[in-house]
């Protein structure tokens, strides 16, 4: 099972989600309510509601949430999780990807997938999954950008 860990790449650092991340994430996420369109939560009416959501998910083992902080940024600009963890089947999925508009379609966002995939396979899992749905057009394009193409 993935635990609290920090993964650092050239363009982004992934770290466990916690209460200290709320101000930066809330500010980054207020730019566009559209980032919540395909998630089962959000947008949040105020920082207190966002903080309550973070408190409710921050220490869960599955899904395990991480922040994404681009190199040079003052704070995190997105979250993602490792979820649907089945060690007995050797599978794990990345999901709950919520990126501020400034982080979307960047090297940092692409590297997030690489860092998670590298950890997953190094930890001995055999399958790394990423949900992608037709109702969310940016999702398949994001998968193609990191060579996680849809099956034909």
What kind of feature is each model-predicted range?
Residues 116:
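Alpha-helical, largely C-terminal catalytic domains
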Residues 109:
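Short, conserved glycine- and acidic-residue-centered signature motifs
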Residues 1-106, 119-123:
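GNAT-family acyltransferases
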Residues 130-140:
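Conserved beta-strand-loop-alpha-helix junction that forms the acyl-donor binding cleft
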Residues 122-132:
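Conserved GNAT acetyl-CoA-binding A-motif
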Residues 131, 149-152:
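Conserved catalytic-core motifs of GNAT/GCN5-like acyltransferases
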């Amino acid at each position: 099972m993935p635990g609290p860990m920090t993964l650092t790449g050239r363009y982004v650092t992934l770290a466990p989600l916690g209460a200290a991340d709320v101000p930066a994430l809330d500010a980054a996420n207020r730019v566009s309510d559209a980032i919540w369109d395909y998630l089962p939560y959000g947008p949040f009416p105020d920082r207190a509601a966002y903080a309550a959501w973070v408190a409710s998910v921050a220490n869960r083992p599955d899904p395990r949430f991480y922040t994404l902080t681009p190199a040079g940024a003052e704070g995190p600009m997105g979250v993602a999780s490792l979820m649907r963890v089945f060690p007995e089947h050797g599978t794990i999925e990345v999901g709950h990807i919520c990126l501020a508009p400034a982080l979307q379609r960047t090297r940092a966002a692409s590297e997030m997938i690489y860092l998670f995939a590298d950890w997953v396979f190094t930890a001995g899992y055999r399958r790394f999954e990423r949900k992608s749905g037709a109702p969310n057009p940016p999702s398949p394009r994001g998968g193609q950008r990191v060579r996680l193409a849809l099956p034909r």
